[in-house]
Amino acid sequence: MTRRETVDVGGVPISYLTAGKGGPLVLLLHGTYWSRVWQPVLDGIAASGLRPVAVDFSGFGRSGGELTVSEASVPRLSAWLVSFLEALGQKGPVMVAGHDIGGGVAQHLMLANRVEVARVAVVNGIMYDSWPVPGVARFRDPAVAAATTRDDVLAARRVSVVKALGRPASEAEIAEYLDPWTDPRVARSWLALAGAADHRYTMEMLPALLQSKTPKLLVWGEDDPFQTIDYAERYAREIPDTRLVRIKSAGHIPMENDPKAVAGALGKFFACKQ
């Protein structure tokens, strides 16, 4: 059963969703959304004998803290995860899945060698020069970000959430997704993440990715209007030890369109002994 827990990381209360009764740790990362994107698949992943942990980065979701632009880059978020894993008491290899910008953070964590990453999955995540999308890129202008209010962030995120779900959604469900950004602190953290969005980070990973032997899985909603499947197809062709699983009739958050298929693909991949 899915539950929310909290751990102290450097004096900041960090929230995460988890499920199951233990097993090998699978770290689940969000991007421009929050841990809520993983909720539909947590029980399914746990059913494979795994311990899923869907963390809210500092300043996001239900976590405390607030991100600055300098703290919100892919490399800095990757480095922060080392402290989070230490706070969890995690020792030994870890497995990671990332959605959206979290997909870039997952790849960076794998390549940085600060912790041993045994397997990596990217779910409709950033790669190559696929990002930032226009709805995020416009906030990279400091003047635009400075003039943006909490209500502006809420309005922009509403548009993105409705589009990303890729299916009809009730007002209650949309409100649940948007709720963290009603806090001005969390809205400012989102603006920091947008301000730090730069595809040079994923492009700089390419030489190391081309040499990487770590098993990798791409799980992709085929109808994603943000991170289009052609990027995933290219990645699967070019990057060693990569397999692509397509989720039909699914958008940017395929966990919401076909949770059984997504949880099944991730559970099988992360539970593999080889």
Regions found by a protein language model. Give the residues of each.
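Conserved HGGG/HGGXW glycine-rich cap/lid loop of the alpha/beta-hydrolase fold
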Residues: 18-62
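Flexible "cap/lid" loop of the alpha/beta hydrolase fold
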Residues: 111, 118-148
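Active-site loop/oxyanion-hole signature of alpha/beta-hydrolase fold enzymes
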Residues: 10, 17, 54-97, 264
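Catalytic active-site module of serine/aspartate enzymes centered on a nucleophile-bearing elbow/loop
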Residues: 242-274
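N-terminal cap/lid segment of alpha/beta-hydrolase-fold proteins
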Residues: 1-13
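Gly/Ala-rich beta-loop-alpha elbow adjacent to hydrolase catalytic centers
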Residues: 98, 102, 106
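Conserved serine/cysteine hydrolase catalytic core
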Residues: 186-237, 246
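Conserved alpha/beta-hydrolase catalytic His-Asp/Glu region
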Residues: 131-133, 151-210
